[in-house]
């Protein structure tokens, strides 16, 4: 019967875990954040409460366009000379000796950010943050046109320190250059980007590769060593690879445009003032000086005419320092007209943030699961840290009765509500946010902030909604800019990991959120970091599990002794059950009285279960939040389970598995076969087989079958959990098996209870003040006439209330004699 008790506790643990999981998932859906009420995204001009930003207005430098250009600045569109084709520029480097931790790629078409790669290295020289879903080699980002050409693939940019830049060829100085045409890779002919990607899939980091290019009509064979793929924290949606989601649109990040001229401004859901050209589609003049890249764009009178304005100029500068996760940005709008103009600009936020693991990850947020893979976070003096779910933005965009954009603060908001500390896009392990310039605590010169999506809401599949491309924008204060003057603003763009020390240094500490179980998750994370000094986080999880289970050993032994005591009580409990088989209340009370008399607490054996549940949840939260566990490998010599914060991904079956099971976001199992969850389920079943006694009746057999089925169902839910969590379960299960075998040998051989006491307690009618009461008197189960007492009878006896005489039923009442005619009595 000890095994029977263990069986019941194991069944209770599985049942409670499943119930907790199902209730938790239901609450996540039930309490998903409601859509905020529609706000006026555009305030009336007469009702503006934001003072003109006169302190940001400055005279335009004489060296800048617009100063002294006279009539040239007011010429029509046809006279404005612009480059015929875009150019790409880079800041930072992938070279580990350069000191840079980022490689930024900028595009002159729109003057925005096309790509940001994190290139920081570990002490062993490997990338600290790589693409966890890519195992092939990396040549470098080339900004190549994906369409096919007759010659090959045109190289538009080569990042410093990339394998393409470090390639060598006989008699040629330097590596690949912009303008080269790639015609072959590893002796395979390639003429479009998809063919090059297919050829790259056959490579591995560290391998040597041959790249054939056409330069000045001459074929050159370059040799280079491929590297790991760095994490592209910002990228175009069309470059998402396997994570590309239908409906997400490709748009550069941090684009700058004219937000307002006079009384005309951008309407909600639009990118430009009605009738004006989108500056994101125009090619800007570009120049680079070391770590600074500048872009300039002039809009002529005719281009400004739809806004009832005159010629203006847009300028912006990007700067990057070594060992910094922030990109400095200076933006300005110049008045190139002959009279003053009311001007304001709009700067868009980042978009295309990494989607890694969106189909299996569980991002922790205060929104009860309403969080998407990419959410908007911001902090103001009035509201503190806030999160706007990508789910809510997509649902808002699908609702035609509401504006596409969700206002975060408006021109008529109180000043503290517009005192902005940061605003950005938040992913599971990374954040990209706009910050005040260094030395300044907040931004006070923006009159409006709003969150939106860079996607076609009708084209995003329902099962991929959490991967929607979320972004935001900021509208500057309105300034009356004199001729030849400018409205300027300095900003920083943080793009980096959610490491506590890094985030605190940039004022973004609130973006790291553990939720309700932070009191467990944070200490567990600290212990894991301590144990990681052994050199492997998988081994650290094993050590953590052994430490926890070792500390719980006294409780486990006590639970085993409790099960042994339950075995001694089992015959008497069975007698009580048979005696009161028709009276559930009497049976439960008699069993409780027996347990109290002998000093037995049936809940004492549940302590290990209740202690393990918070540890399980805390470890799950740690794996979902702590970036140190991202990319932590099971072993350095294998690519299997190379990310303990993700499924182990032993085998890719997405090419042939039914999409309902193996699809990204659409399947129950995902595109990879994972072996660790199978081992976990096998160990659970083995424990049940080893320690569950044979069924003695039909009810016990049914219970055992149900437990087996529930274990299999639990394996279905666990199929996509992080590999680190599976290692915890495997270690804990193996410990449990060994512990049961050891404890069973150390249990006392003598009985815990006196058999005479057990028989006397079971035979008695109850306990009164700790003494056995064998009478069937006032508290007995039968009345004086021998009939069983009802619950009402027993309640009245305890309360001392005499029984009231019940009114006779209608059928039992005596009818009065009828007085029909002719029925009189004779005298």
Curated annotation (Swiss-Prot):
<keyword id="KW-0812">Transmembrane</keyword>
<feature type="region of interest" description="Disordered">
    <location>
        <begin position="58"/>
        <end position="94"/>
    </location>
</feature>
<feature type="compositionally biased region" description="Acidic residues">
    <location>
        <begin position="58"/>
        <end position="78"/>
    </location>
</feature>
<comment type="subunit">
    <text>Interacts with the Sec translocase complex via SecD. Specifically interacts with transmembrane segments of nascent integral membrane proteins during membrane integration.</text>
</comment>
<feature type="compositionally biased region" description="Polar residues">
    <location>
        <begin position="84"/>
        <end position="94"/>
    </location>
</feature>
<dbReference type="GO" id="GO:0032977">
    <property type="term" value="F:membrane insertase activity"/>
</dbReference>
<keyword id="KW-0143">Chaperone</keyword>
<keyword id="KW-0653">Protein transport</keyword>
<dbReference type="InterPro" id="IPR047196">
    <property type="entry name" value="YidC_ALB_C"/>
</dbReference>
<feature type="region of interest" description="YidC">
    <location>
        <begin position="218"/>
        <end position="827"/>
    </location>
</feature>
<feature type="transmembrane region" description="Helical">
    <location>
        <begin position="710"/>
        <end position="730"/>
    </location>
</feature>
<dbReference type="Pfam" id="PF14849">
    <property type="entry name" value="YidC_periplas"/>
</dbReference>
<dbReference type="GO" id="GO:0005886">
    <property type="term" value="C:plasma membrane"/>
</dbReference>
<dbReference type="InterPro" id="IPR038221">
    <property type="entry name" value="YidC_periplasmic_sf"/>
</dbReference>
<feature type="transmembrane region" description="Helical">
    <location>
        <begin position="666"/>
        <end position="686"/>
    </location>
</feature>
<keyword id="KW-0813">Transport</keyword>
<dbReference type="InterPro" id="IPR001708">
    <property type="entry name" value="YidC/ALB3/OXA1/COX18"/>
</dbReference>
<dbReference type="GO" id="GO:0015031">
    <property type="term" value="P:protein transport"/>
</dbReference>
<dbReference type="InterPro" id="IPR019998">
    <property type="entry name" value="Membr_insert_YidC"/>
</dbReference>
<dbReference type="InterPro" id="IPR001478">
    <property type="entry name" value="PDZ"/>
</dbReference>
<feature type="compositionally biased region" description="Basic residues">
    <location>
        <begin position="812"/>
        <end position="827"/>
    </location>
</feature>
<feature type="transmembrane region" description="Helical">
    <location>
        <begin position="524"/>
        <end position="544"/>
    </location>
</feature>
<dbReference type="Pfam" id="PF13180">
    <property type="entry name" value="PDZ_2"/>
</dbReference>
<feature type="compositionally biased region" description="Basic and acidic residues">
    <location>
        <begin position="782"/>
        <end position="801"/>
    </location>
</feature>
<dbReference type="InterPro" id="IPR036034">
    <property type="entry name" value="PDZ_sf"/>
</dbReference>
<dbReference type="Pfam" id="PF02096">
    <property type="entry name" value="60KD_IMP"/>
</dbReference>
<dbReference type="InterPro" id="IPR028055">
    <property type="entry name" value="YidC/Oxa/ALB_C"/>
</dbReference>
<feature type="transmembrane region" description="Helical">
    <location>
        <begin position="598"/>
        <end position="618"/>
    </location>
</feature>
<comment type="function">
    <text>Required for the insertion and/or proper folding and/or complex formation of integral membrane proteins into the membrane. Involved in integration of membrane proteins that insert both dependently and independently of the Sec translocase complex, as well as at least some lipoproteins. Aids folding of multispanning membrane proteins.</text>
</comment>
<keyword id="KW-1133">Transmembrane helix</keyword>
<protein>
    <recommendedName>
        <fullName>Membrane protein insertase YidC</fullName>
    </recommendedName>
</protein>
<dbReference type="GO" id="GO:0051205">
    <property type="term" value="P:protein insertion into membrane"/>
</dbReference>
<keyword id="KW-0997">Cell inner membrane</keyword>
<keyword id="KW-0472">Membrane</keyword>
<feature type="region of interest" description="Disordered">
    <location>
        <begin position="758"/>
        <end position="827"/>
    </location>
</feature>
<feature type="domain" description="PDZ">
    <location>
        <begin position="1"/>
        <end position="217"/>
    </location>
</feature>
<comment type="similarity">
    <text>Belongs to the OXA1/ALB3/YidC family. Type 1 subfamily.</text>
</comment>
<dbReference type="InterPro" id="IPR028053">
    <property type="entry name" value="Membr_insert_YidC_N"/>
</dbReference>
<feature type="transmembrane region" description="Helical">
    <location>
        <begin position="11"/>
        <end position="31"/>
    </location>
</feature>
<keyword id="KW-1003">Cell membrane</keyword>
């Amino acid at each position: 019967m000890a095994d029977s008790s263990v069986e019941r506790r194991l069944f209770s643990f599985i049942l409670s875990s499943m119930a907790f999981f199902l209730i938790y998932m239901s609450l996540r859906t039930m309490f998903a954040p409601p859509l905020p009420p529609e706000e006026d995204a555009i305030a009336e001009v007469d009702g503006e409460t934001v003072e003109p930003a006169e302190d940001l207005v400055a005279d335009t430098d004489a060296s800048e366009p617009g100063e002294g250009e006279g009539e040239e600045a007011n010429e029509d569109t046809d006279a404005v000379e612009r480059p015929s084709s875009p150019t790409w520029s880079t800041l930072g480097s992938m070279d580990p000796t350069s000191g840079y931790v980022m490689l930024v790629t900028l595009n002159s078409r729109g003057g925005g950010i096309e790509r940001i790669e994190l290139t920081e290295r570990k002490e062993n020289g490997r990338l600290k943050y790589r693409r966890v879903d890519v195992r092939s080699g990396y040549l470098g980002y080339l900004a190549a046109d994906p369409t096919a050409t007759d010659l090959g693939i045109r190289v538009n940019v080569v990042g410093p320190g990339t394998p393409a830049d470090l390639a060598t060829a006989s008699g040629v100085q330097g590596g690949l250059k912009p303008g080269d045409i790639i015609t072959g890779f590893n002796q395979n002919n390639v003429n479009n980007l998809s063919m090059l990607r297919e050829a790259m899939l056959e490579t591995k980091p560290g391998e040597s590769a041959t790249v054939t290019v056409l330069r000045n009509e001459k074929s050159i064979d370059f040799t280079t060593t491929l590297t790991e793929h760095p994490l592209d924290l910002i990228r175009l949606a069309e470059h998402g690879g396997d994570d590309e989601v239908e409906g997400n649109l490709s748009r550069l990040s941090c684009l700058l445009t004219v937000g307002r001229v006079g009384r005309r401004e951008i309407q909600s859901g639009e990118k430009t003032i009605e009738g004006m050209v989108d500056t994101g589609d125009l090619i800007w003049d570009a120049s680079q000086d070391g770590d600074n890249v500048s872009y300039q764009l002039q809009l002529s009178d005719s281009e400004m005419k739809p806004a009832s304005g005159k010629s203006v100029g847009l300028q912006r500068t990007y700067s990057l320092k070594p060992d910094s996760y922030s990109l400095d940005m200076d933006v300005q709008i110049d008045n190139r007209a002959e009279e003053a103009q009311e001007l304001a600009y709009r700067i868009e936020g980042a978009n295309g943030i990494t989607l890694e693991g969106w189909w299996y990850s569980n991002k922790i947020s205060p929104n009860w699961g309403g969080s998407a893979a990419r959410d908007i976070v911001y902090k103001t003096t009035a509201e503190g840290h806030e999160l706007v779910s990508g789910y809510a933005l997509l649902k808002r965009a699908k609702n035609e009765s509401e504006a596409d954009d969700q206002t975060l603060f408006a021109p008529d908001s109180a000043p503290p509500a517009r005192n902005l500390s940061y605003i950005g896009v938040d992913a599971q392990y990374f954040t990209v946010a706009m910050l005040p310039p260094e030395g300044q605590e907040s931004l006070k010169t923006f009159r409006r902030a709003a969150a939106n999506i860079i996607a076609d809401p009708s084209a995003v599949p329902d099962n991929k909604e959490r991967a929607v491309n979320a972004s935001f924008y900021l509208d500057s204060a309105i300034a009356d800019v004199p001729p030849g003057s400018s409205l300027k603003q300095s900003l920083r763009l943080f793009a980096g990991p959610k490491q506590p020390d890094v985030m605190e240094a940039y004022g973004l500490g609130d973006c790291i959120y553990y939720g309700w179980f932070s009191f467990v998750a944070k200490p567990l994370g600290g212990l894991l970091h301590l144990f990681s000094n052994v050199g492997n986080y998988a081994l650290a999880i094993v050590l953590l599990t052994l430490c926890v289970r070792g500390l719980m050993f006294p409780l486990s032994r006590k639970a085993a002794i409790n099960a042994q005591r339950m075995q001694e009580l089992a015959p008497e409990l069975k007698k009580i059950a048979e005696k009161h088989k028709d009276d559930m209340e009497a049976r439960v009370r008699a069993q409780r009285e027996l347990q109290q008399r002998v000093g037995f607490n049936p809940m004492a054996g549940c302590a290990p279960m209740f202690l393990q549940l918070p540890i399980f949840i805390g470890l799950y939260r740690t794996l979902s939040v702590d970036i140190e566990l991202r990319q932590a490998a099971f072993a350095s010599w294998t690519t299997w389970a190379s990310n303990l914060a993700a499924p182990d991904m032993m085998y890719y079956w997405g090419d042939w598995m039914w999409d309902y099971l193996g699809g990204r976001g659409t399947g129950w199992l995902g595109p990879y076969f994972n072996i660790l969850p199978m081992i976990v389920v096998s160990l659970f079943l083995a424990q049940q087989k080893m320690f569950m006694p044979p069924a003695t009746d039909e009810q016990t057999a049914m219970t055992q079958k149900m437990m087996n089925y529930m274990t299999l169902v639990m394996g279905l839910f666990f199929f996509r959990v992080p590999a680190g969590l599976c290692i915890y379960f495997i270690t804990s299960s193996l410990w449990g098996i060994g512990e049961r075998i050891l404890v069973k040998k150390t249990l006392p051989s003598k009985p815990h209870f006196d058999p005479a006491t057990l028989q006397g307690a079971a035979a008695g009618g109850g306990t009164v003040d700790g003494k056995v009461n064998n009478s069937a008197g006032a508290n007995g189960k039968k009345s004086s006439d021998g009939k069983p007492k009802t619950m009402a009878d027993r309640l009245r006896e305890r309360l001392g209330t005499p029984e009231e005489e019940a009114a006779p039923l209608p059928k039992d009442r005596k009818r009065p004699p009828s007085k029909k005619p002719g029925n009189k009595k004779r005298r």
